[in-house]
A protein has these predicted regions:
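Rossmann-like dinucleotide/flavin-binding elements
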Residues: 12-37, 77-87, 92, 106-108, ...
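Residues at alpha-helix termini
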Residues: 29, 70-71, 101, 162
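Solvent-exposed alpha-helices and their adjacent loops that cap or buttress functional pockets
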Residues: 3-6, 70, 90-93, 112, ...
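Flavin (primarily FAD) binding-site architecture
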Residues: 101-119
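Long, contiguous hydrophobic alpha-helical segments, chiefly transmembrane helices and signal peptides
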Residues: 43-47, 56, 61, 156-157
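N-terminal glycine-rich dinucleotide-binding loop that anchors FAD/FMN and/or NAD(P) in oxidoreductases
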Residues: 50-77, 113-129, 135
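Fe-S ferredoxin-like electron-transfer domains
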Residues: 1-35, 39-40, 47-55, 65, ...
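Conserved N-terminal/central alpha/beta ligand/cofactor-binding core
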Residues: 47-48, 64-97
Length: 169
């Protein structure tokens, strides 16, 4: 990879997940200066927060991000959320272009009568798992019920069992 000569354009990329990082990479390759904004404390998006720990151990997302930032012409500002402390109109006024790669912002809530402590959505639970230095600090019950049928549900079930849940349904 070699960066093209300075193009004289500055681009804002909102979201430091796979799409935002890929966009920043291609823009930097063409000689554009890129500022990536992300609401989370670390970049990487679902690669950092959404892949179960048993599937991708270590800091692979941060290693990739560190490599990307060494290319030149790319900076990242974490903890900046679009619409709160980062107005879209301001970005449009300060940059030649804005690329929105905001990704998944939430999950569907399950309405369960009598819900109590211990009920968590799988996306947040997997995120907590990925960010925990000691996986045994992440709470898991002896009997775990996972509601859902996608890969996130499978990841939550497998990770629960790996952490010592006696029964996972």
């Amino acid at each position: 990879f070699s960066r093209a000569p300075e193009a004289g354009r500055k681009v804002a990329v909102v979201g430091a997940g796979p799409a935002g990082l890929a966009c920043a990479h291609r823009l930097a390759m063409k000689g554009h200066d890129v500022v990536i904004f992300d609401s989370k404390p670390k970049g990487g998006g679902l690669n950092e927060y959404g892949i179960a720990a048993y599937k991708a151990p270590g800091d692979f997302a941060q290693t990739e991000l560190d490599w990307l930032l060494k290319i030149g012409g790319i900076t990242i500002e974490n903890g900046r959320a679009l619409g709160t402390d980062l107005p879209l109109a301001d970005l449009q006024g300060q940059y030649d272009a804005v690329f929105l790669a905001i990704g998944l912002a939430g999950v569907n809530k399950v309405a369960v009568d009598g819900a109590h402590e211990g009920l968590a959505n799988a996306v947040d639970w997997i995120s907590d798992m990925r960010q925990s230095a000691d996986k045994t600090d992440v709470p898991v019950g002896r009997n775990v019920v996972v509601i859902g049928g996608g890969m996130t549900a499978v990841d939550a079930a497998v990770q629960s069992k790996l952490l010592g849940a006696e029964q996972v349904t």
